[in-house]
Amino acid sequence: MGIPAAFRWLSTRYPKIISPVIEDQPLVMEDGSTIPVDTTRPNPNGEEFDNLYLDMNGIVHPCSHPEDRPAPKDEEEMMMEVFRYTDRVVNMVRPRKILMIAVDGVAPRAKMNQQRSRRFRSAQEAQEKEQDKQELIKMLKQQNGGNLSTESLETVTKKAFDSNSITPGTPFMDILALSLRYWCQYKLNTDPGWAKLKIIISDATVPGEGEHKIMNFVRSQRASPDHDPNTRHVIYGLDADLIMLGLATHEPHFRVLREDVFFQDQKARLCKICGQKGHDAQNCRGEEKKKDGEHDEKDKGVALKPFIWLHVAVLREYLAVELGVPNLPFRFDLERAVDDWIFMCCFVGNDFLPHLPALEIREHGIDTLTKIWKDNLPVMGGYVTKDGHIDLERAQVILDGLAQQEDNIFKRRKEQEDRREANFKRRKLQNEVNGRGGRQGGPSHPKKINGHENPENGLPLQAVGAYTGRHEQTLTHDMVVNRSTAPDANVANKSAASVLKAQLQSQKSLSNPKPENPEQESPSALGKRKASSIEEGNSSVPDAASVSTPSTSAEEGPVDDVRLWEDGYADRYYEKKFHKDPKDIEFRHGVGRAYVEGLAWVLLYYFQGCPSWEWYYPYHYAPFAADFKDIAKMNISFEKGRVSKPFEQLMSVLPAASRHALPEVFHDLMLNPESNIIDFYPEDFEIDLNGKKFAWQGVALLPFIEMPRLLAAVQSKYPELSAADSARNEMGRDVLIFSEGHESLYDEVLTKFYSKKQGDSKFKLNPKKSDGLSGRVEKKEGYVPHSELKYPLERNSMPDLDYDRSVSVYYDFPQASQTHKSMLLRGVQLPTPALTQNDIQDMRSRANRGGRGGFGRGHDRGGYNGPGMTRGSQYNRNQGGYGRGNGHYPPAPASHVPPPPGAPGFGIGVPPPPPPNSYHNQPYDNRYGASSGYNQYRGPPHPANGAPGYHGHGDASSERGRGSGGYSSRGRYRDNRSYR
């Protein structure tokens, strides 16, 4: 959800949600041949899975510009890496029904602002790295008498792949789409484990973020009467919001699959300068790579990172305990409580809104909101959200509770920061006294050499003449620069090339105090960075934790002119951040209303799909909790709006430095000073640290795109586009691919589309023949069954197939007749509980003591403790871990009687119609949506002749908060219309 460190926080607080993936590996024979994994065999993880969803951008990015190995040489090598990675993930999960591959398409306007910030930062860093490389080459040549080996020159000068190309509408995304279609068809023809799969490919031409296209599919299938409520889902991706999205489906058999980003295999890490194993950039000597074998064919490469499961079902168990409130005047509903928890997480961070100043996940911001919610739930009379809609009156109660604590939160934060700073200085002084100033002496006590300190960022110096020509070639970085403790962020953020250049520069300034060439006397400054490419929460970025920002001294942090811990902070905040008169209170309330509108948009996006493609939050900063006034009077509604075309999004999010990804006709708009939109593409932009210490945490103050002005400029160039470019600017469709191994579906499609009896060019799938898949398929013009399958790229890295046994058709999701409901479906069988009574009691006792954490480290909880993790106990299948032990359901609140496992009433039948499209200030009552789940009194089973519907029990009082459950069990609306 855009929450920095959210995954780490969740996995630490709720340790049993994590377990390691058991993975079969291909068998390598003595002659070097490989026997692939037989995925037709049972899954070694002890459970079979139906559907696997790949958020493909989480695969494409690490494959195209990896952190732990040399980058692929070209796009074809990248595609081969994507194939290998995808194959590995599919082999782990072994889906038996559906594989969905979703690539990010055009995003809603609300997401474009975040994309714009990331891409501008990325381009700025790439430009600085390129400048560093050019200066490094010049200095290396000077050091080596004007000569550099070909291999060393290639290592330094190779132009890095521009990751901004991984955006809809670029040629790279066309190549990716063609390659993925080929790969899936190839696997359907050649791999028995894939033969019966139905593969849905939603490439970058289909609008929407990848994970949200996946969720739209899950919701569409869930609304079908033929949906199996015990479908087992796995979604792969690196974003923490996948966890929230998994919860929001209310499908209990849901797992998130991801790499264990905490795992660090030091031996496998590669040097960023020379590309060799066994050392990092700080210890690089600049030596040429030693080949393992005549052609380096014996190089074993990098060890594979392990993968981990995140069990949404276990997280639901934890939340059932944590969110339980005893003695409620209405029935506790876990499904609604989980939705409220997701809503509260939105305040701490998401991809569309800045987090509230008082809330940081590292400071237990979610705990703070949860406590307020639990304290007020009985008096609110019901839940804050319903199926993605917000009860604004109840939301006001939560915000008022936070506002009362806001001043103390800021003061407590300052006290904690001061204590940390004091402890740091104390330890630093202790180290200096003890002679432990860090590696190689460290920068904590720089020596004066020849009467001066190192002018480059206070780095330690060596005496003049200390190095001979022989020594110059064997220097390591740590002899000159200690990046991990550098007081300036611009040192810690430097590329490997810039660090090596700084080393050479420092050395040269000592050994040659009077250079002959005047140009050498004042080389350009390095690392004057206003932005960092380190993304929030990206724990895979090296040294992310050590990146600091420019400061007035090594001891002082950046100046904070808002000073949230002092009286008058609100006036200073709006004056400094919004440039508004501190007396303009109505403006503050307007910002609060815009933020509430954003919360309404985000929640609908998570639960129902995109409510508006054009809405966005028009500020860089969030309001204070005290600025949310009278929000219950708001009437929020959204217009669906227009979806941007790919080139329009590219022009919205790309900097001019990445214009190569756009057709040339647009370049002038980004470069010409007379362009009507030149102000959208600043080369330099401010990063506001906003009270933070690390550059990657700062706010990029880029101008917001004025869409009417941009559209007028971009659309004026459309007539100049070539036919190929125009095709890249069009919207595409989802594709369904399957093979003759899926006999019933294969025969039906061939009969209706390609036989003498063929009829209409589209038809509705029969779930009995498609193994449960609902939707409509349409014939692809120009597609001929049983034709040749051609590899689409130039070097023929993969074979052609003379006879393609797969079929490809367009696919449309089924249109639901109602909104997605926050309920468990009839017939669902909940997984075996993972939490024991001791786990539950531990959580409750901590909550009663006001504790913040999940479990003590001294307890044996059966949680995962894989390589690189710091958890309480080693995961063990026999310790009562996920789905293994004889645990129990968490006890219900005191006022309720928990049902036995498998009790009926998990929400029956087709849900009622959607609520209105607008928000109103009338509060929701509790007659609606008291769907059954963990720890609820479900009431008696439906009578045999009763119409299905929500299980309600009680009189459904019209008074707010007094109804004890759902709609009437008679299966009718209040106006007597039957809903089935």
UniProtKB/Swiss-Prot annotation:
Polar residues: bias regions: 503-514, 535-554
Biased composition (Pro residues): 890-903
Subcellular location: Nucleus
EC number assigned by the record: 3.1.13.-
GO CC, any one term: nucleus
UniProt GO MF annotations: 5'-3' RNA exonuclease activity; RNA binding; zinc ion binding
Highest taxon in the source lineage: Eukaryota
Start and end residues, zinc fingers (CCHC-type): 269-286
Alphabetical list of Pfam families matching this protein: XRN_M (PF17846), XRN_N (PF03159)
Disulfide bonds: none
Keyword entries, A-Z: Coiled coil, Exonuclease, Hydrolase, Metal-binding, mRNA processing, Nuclease, Nucleus, rRNA processing, Transcription, Transcription regulation, Transcription termination, Zinc, Zinc-finger
Keyword Transcription set for record: yes
Any one of the GO BP annotations: nuclear-transcribed mRNA catabolic process
Oligomeric and partner information: Interacts with RAI1; the interaction is direct, stabilizes RAT1 protein structure and may stimulate its exoribonuclease activity. The interaction also stimulates RAI1 pyrophosphohydrolase activity, probably by recruiting it to mRNA substrates.
Sequence similarity: Belongs to the 5'-3' exonuclease family. XRN2/RAT1 subfamily.
Record's protein name: 5'-3' exoribonuclease 2
Organism: Gibberella zeae (strain ATCC MYA-4620 / CBS 123657 / FGSC 9075 / NRRL 31084 / PH-1)
Gene symbol of the encoding locus: RAT1
